[in-house]
């Protein structure tokens, strides 16, 4: 028979019911509990210190790169559609929810006739916007798209920017497009430093030539 040794001989195992209740109270009710209650009551009684908003009367301002319902962009100058019908978004879609039908127009150029996205199946991963070479498809910030049916399709006319609202189209809005401060987040490469060094040398040579004159 094996010999068992108590790790903490000073700790007594409760036997009676009162000893068990007393041990449970000592372990559950401690000073940290009242500290947490004090912090909660302090934040609760503060005015204008709410961490939530009164939705739907108030809405959170989302970042431009938030991935919500898709948008198809136009060129502001010519008002033409940016989509060239390459089909990369349809091929890269991991949810298999994008369908595109293309044809050739009278000039022999590819034209997108039908474009649909199953919004109920889409997981809004953003791959379609990232792979688009023309920045034709981006993600907007319209997130209120609840529907009664699981299969909810959006079509080309639903995503494409109307011509009468083209002036309000923001170039850098939506995931897949470059941010306004994108240059600040680009990691400098050795080639960048070489170019900067060449510019410094050119400026020095220009100054020396000006002084010699």
Curated annotation (Swiss-Prot):
GO biological process, one term: aerobic respiration
Chain sites annotated for binding [4Fe-4S] cluster 1: 83, 86, 89, 132
UniProt-annotated binding residues for [4Fe-4S] cluster 2: 93, 122, 125, 128
Cofactor binding comment, as recorded: Binds 2 [4Fe-4S] clusters per subunit.
One function term, GO molecular function aspect: quinone binding
Enzymatic reactions: a quinone + NADH + 5 H(+)(in) = a quinol + NAD(+) + 4 H(+)(out)
Top-level EC class: translocase
Alphabetical list of Pfam families matching this protein: Fer4_7 (PF12838)
The species this protein was found in: Campylobacter jejuni subsp. doylei (strain ATCC BAA-1458 / RM4099 / 269.97)
Self-association state and partner proteins as the record states: NDH-1 is composed of 14 different subunits. Subunits NuoA, H, J, K, L, M, N constitute the membrane sector of the complex.
Domain called 4Fe-4S ferredoxin-type: residue spans: 74-103, 113-142
This protein's record includes keyword RNA-binding: no
Protein name per Swiss-Prot or TrEMBL: NADH-quinone oxidoreductase subunit I
UniProt keyword Zinc present: no
Stretch forming the signal peptide: none
Cofactor: [4Fe-4S] cluster
Cellular component, GO annotation: plasma membrane
Localization in the cell: Cell inner membrane
Keywords: 4Fe-4S, Cell inner membrane, Cell membrane, Iron, Iron-sulfur, Membrane, Metal-binding, NAD, Quinone, Repeat, Translocase, Ubiquinone
Its biological purpose: NDH-1 shuttles electrons from NADH, via FMN and iron-sulfur (Fe-S) centers, to quinones in the respiratory chain. The immediate electron acceptor for the enzyme in this species is believed to be ubiquinone. Couples the redox reaction to proton translocation (for every two electrons transferred, four hydrogen ions are translocated across the cytoplasmic membrane), and thus conserves the redox energy in a proton gradient.
Family designation: Belongs to the complex I 23 kDa subunit family.
Classification via Gene3D superfamilies: 3.30.70.3270
Major location category of this protein: membrane
EC number: 7.1.1.-
Membrane topology: Peripheral membrane protein
């Amino acid at each position: 028979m094996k010999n068992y040794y108590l790790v903490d001989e000073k700790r007594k195992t409760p036997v009676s019911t009162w000893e068990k209740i007393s041990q449970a109270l000592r372990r559950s009710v401690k000073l940290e509990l009242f500290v947490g209650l004090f912090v909660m009551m302090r934040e609760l009684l503060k005015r204008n210190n709410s961490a939530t908003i009164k939705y739907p009367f108030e809405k959170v301002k989302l970042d431009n790169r938030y991935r919500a319902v898709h948008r198809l962009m136009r060129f502001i100058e010519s008002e033409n559609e940016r989509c060239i019908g390459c089909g990369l978004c349809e091929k890269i879609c991991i949810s298999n929810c994008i369908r595109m039908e293309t044809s050739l127009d009278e000039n022999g150029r590819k034209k997108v006739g039908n474009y649909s996205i199953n919004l109920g199946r889409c997981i809004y991963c953003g791959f379609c916007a990232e792979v688009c070479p023309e920045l034709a498809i981006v993600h907007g910030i319209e997130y209120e798209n609840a529907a009664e049916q699981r299969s909810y399709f959006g079509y080309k006319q639903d995503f494409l920017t109307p011509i009468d609202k083209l002036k309000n189209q923001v170039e850098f809005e939506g995931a897949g497009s470059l941010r306004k401060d994108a240059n600040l987040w680009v990691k400098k490469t050795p080639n960048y430093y070489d170019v900067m060094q060449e510019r410094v040398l050119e400026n020095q040579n220009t100054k020396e030539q000006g002084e010699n004159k």
